[in-house]
A protein has these predicted regions:
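N-terminal secretory signal peptides
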Residues: 1-10, 14-28
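A short amphipathic alpha-helical interaction element
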Residues: 63-109
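Sec/Tat signal peptide C-region and signal peptidase I cleavage site
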Residues: 29-33
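Second-shell loop/turn segments in exported
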Residues: 56-64, 81-87, 106-107, 150-158, ...
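Gly/Pro-biased beta-strand-loop elements
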Residues: 198, 204-303
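Exported/periplasmic cell-wall-interacting domains
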Residues: 270-342
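Short alpha-helical segments in extracytoplasmic peptidoglycan/chitin-binding modules
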Residues: 71-75, 85-86, 96-101, 163-171, ...
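Extracellular LysM carbohydrate-binding repeats and other cell-envelope/extracellular binding modules
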Residues: 91-137, 179-208
Length: 342
């Protein structure tokens, strides 16, 4: 893996890079793991009941349902992102529950206990809200992301594949969960139910980043080294391009970056692969934002595959969901220290 910014490309918001995504990016945008398709509810979703629920069940790995989704939304708003909000308690949520508990002086069990519910509910804002779909939302353009890099290089922009995907990212949830909340197709003018992630309050202080390779988590610390935010990440494969231990710093930020696939810099690239430039866009291999690091060719960036984050290995760099990478960029500026530990 290598990421070599070019002054000419940067002036056009383009980065020269080798592949920094899981599985060489040669799988289709939607192909990672076969998951059961979410089924729409038989009747309209009861947003009021969801928002007014006061139950505090013990949630642990394997739990599913509305209570899990409520906890995920509150964790997201507290800046301890589970990645996609989907109503399923998996590894990312367990890590973030533990991080949240540590940050709030609770026993770090990794399970949502009664004490954790009490702490999370201090937020008070409704967990779900309504959103009226705009003409801009549905106008696109939307286009299927090709499998092959040379085919991606022919696209003018690596855009979303559908309005469902675009709105899912906007509201930090999986497309399947968005379908659970809303019956029928999404059209301009339609009022839909979405996670109320806009109610998130920015941490008052942030000074450095710590990356825990074993946990696959990026932590944000304040000046007193207290934990104020956490995000799931995917990192480089230990055999091909492992994330190095030690201290780096954020060097620059590029919004809506382009990408150059350079197989000569990849250990696992097909022998017949060609170097190609790929246009910017949310489904670009490095997503919607790039935070360059002082170690040459390395960066923290978004991804076109949010469901993979925290679960897959990459060929280098630090992958986050697009929305989490964008949120991180509001906290982490040039000069921010990035400490990587095993």
């Amino acid at each position: 893996m290598s990421f070599t910014p070019s002054p000419v490309h940067l002036s056009r918001r383009t980065l020269v890079a080798a592949l920094c995504l899981a599985g060489l990016g040669l799988a289709s945008h939607s192909a990672w793991a076969a998951k059961p398709k979410a089924k729409a509810a038989d009747g309209p979703f009861d947003m009021e009941a969801f928002n007014n629920a006061t139950d505090a069940p013990l949630l642990r790995s394997g739990s599913q349902g509305a209570a899990v989704a409520r906890a995920q939304i509150m964790l997201d708003r507290a800046w301890f992102s589970c990645g996609e909000i989907d109503g399923r308690f998996a590894a990312n949520m367990q890590r973030m529950v533990r991080a949240y508990q540590t940050a709030h002086d609770l026993k770090a069990t990794g399970t949502v206990t009664a004490e954790t519910w009490t702490s999370l509910r201090k937020d008070g804002a409704p967990l779900l809200t309504t959103y009226t779909v705009t003409e801009k939302d549905t106008a696109g353009p939307f286009e299927k992301t090709p499998v092959a890099m040379d085919e991606r290089a022919k696209m003018k922009a690596l855009v979303y594949e559908s309005v469902d995907e675009a709105l899912s990212e906007k509201f930090h949830c999986s497309p399947g969960y968005l379908k659970q909340l809303n019956r029928g197709s999404i059209e301009s003018g339609k009022q839909i139910t979405v996670p109320n992630v806009a109610a998130s309050a920015t941490p008052v202080s942030a000074a450095s980043i710590e990356i825990d390779k074993s946990e696959r988590v990026l932590y944000v610390l304040d000046t007193a080294q207290r934990l104020v935010a956490g995000f799931p990440i995917s990192i480089g494969n230990e055999k091909n391009d492992p994330l190095p231990l030690g201290t780096m710093a954020i060097k620059n930020e590029v919004k809506n970056p382009g990408f150059t696939y350079n197989p000569a810099l990849l250990k696992t690239a097909p022998k017949d692969a060609q170097k190609v430039d790929i246009a910017a866009g949310p489904n670009n291999p490095v997503g919607s934002i790039w935070l360059g690091l002082t170690k040459p060719h390395w960066g923290i960036h978004g991804t076109p595959n949010p469901s993979n984050v925290g679960h897959s290995e990459t060929n280098g760099c630090i992958h986050m969901t697009n929305w989490d990478a964008e949120r991180l960029s509001t906290l982490a500026k040039a000069g921010f220290k990035v400490n990587v530990k095993a």
